[in-house]
Amino acid sequence: MMTSTDLDALMTDLGQRARKAARILALTPSAAKDKALRAAAQAIRIDTKLILAANAKDMEAGEAKGLSKAMLDRLMLNPARVEAMAKGLEDIARLPDPVGRSLAEWTRPNGMSIARIAVPLGVIGIIYESRPNVTADAAALCLKSGNATILRGGSESFHSSQAILTALKGGFTACGLPADAVQMVPTTDRAAVGVMLRLSNYIDVIVPRGGKSLVERVVAESRIPLFQHLEGICHTYVDGSADLEMAKTIVLNAKMRRTGICGATETLLVDRACAGTHLAPLVAMLIDAGCEVRGDAVAQAADARVIPASDADWSTEYLDAIISVGVVDGVGAAVEHINTHGSHHTEAIVAEDSQVAETFLNGCDSAIVLWNASTQFADGGEFGMGAEIGISTGKMHARGPVGVEQLCTFKYVVKGNGQVRPG
């Protein structure tokens, strides 16, 4: 354990170095950033064996620690996932540079021209838990948008993240970018998080990515603005107008494709108007696929294998092969349930009736709403953003997938030819 004085000195040094790097990155040309991202992608490929060996240490420790199946899935790397990280960096390199974009332009009656221009936020602090791929995604998105990054990964993924960081730094510095463009807190001491959240002189925004307890701590303690992602309590509503086969395909994917991601459906709502034809097949499909179903009285009557749902189940992010299933009286009741029990993340409706669908899309107070598509599309890569640094469920500055454009703020550039303000 480090002393509080040592931790303060360590974190302040990281902050000062990040601030210096951010000033360089803000003026780095697009071509140089893209070259560095491609070099980092190649470095990750070259270091695949080292990264997997480091991940094996984390997996062994995680299993010994008794991490859940969902947490272990998030932590686990294999050659395909490492290659996906490398390709993700190359995808980000191909994105348009968000820095320097003219967001709006106008000319005043006195002849002055005014433009609102996108600029980097500066230094972004990212606090995350078990997903080592966040190391690569976050660093790449921040670099592309001209920001320096301070990463604080969880102890579960410490060795994996360090190995990925080494590859990233090698790629960045080989192309002439500052080594401090991306840094990682070099200790697993939880007290480092508290110090990081007080570095308002050096960090411009905090992005927490992890479980409810982590995000709640960050929200409570941070003196720095943050992109908030509390939970992914996502819903799929099957309307009375829904095609059953489409509903089955979407629901199975939304729940079971990957149960441990924030876009996985946690509650299935079925319109009472189609419960007689749709509910039992949907429930049976989920149970047969290995999903535990916790349901209301109607769902229990549809299949004897359904477990009674508690009040808490309707507001639970399972991140596992468990789902709550309930019957509601139409789209209005579905929207009311979602806005009451959800986390404002992602909701989907399966319906053939476009008017009902519009009611749902307009009524759900969530960052992402989908019609006839799986909630697992709640992902920056699937949105064409290259990757995401997280999904913001707040409403200030950024909402939904946070990609390169959302990692910029703006300045006003005013050009005149001698104008002065009259007295």
Curated annotation (Swiss-Prot):
Keywords: Amino-acid biosynthesis, Cytoplasm, NADP, Oxidoreductase, Proline biosynthesis. It comes from the Bacteria. It is found in: Cytoplasm. One of its GO terms (biological process) is L-proline biosynthetic process. Pathway: Amino-acid biosynthesis; L-proline biosynthesis; L-glutamate 5-semialdehyde from L-glutamate: step 2/2. Its main location: cytoplasm. CDD domains: ALDH_F18-19_ProA-GPR. The keyword Cytoplasm applies. Gene3D superfamilies: Aldehyde Dehydrogenase, Chain A, domain 1, Aldehyde Dehydrogenase, Chain A, domain 2. Its EC number is 1.2.1.41. It is an enzyme of class 1 (oxidoreductase). Pfam families: Aldedh. GO terms for cellular component: cytoplasm. One of its GO terms (molecular function) is NADP binding. It catalyses: L-glutamate 5-semialdehyde + phosphate + NADP(+) = L-glutamyl 5-phosphate + NADPH + H(+). Catalyzes the NADPH-dependent reduction of L-glutamate 5-phosphate into L-glutamate 5-semialdehyde and phosphate. The product spontaneously undergoes cyclization to form 1-pyrroline-5-carboxylate. Belongs to the gamma-glutamyl phosphate reductase family. This is Gamma-glutamyl phosphate reductase. It comes from Paramagnetospirillum magneticum (strain ATCC 700264 / AMB-1) (Magnetospirillum magneticum). The lineage of its organism: Bacteria, Pseudomonadati, Pseudomonadota, Alphaproteobacteria, Rhodospirillales. The gene is proA.
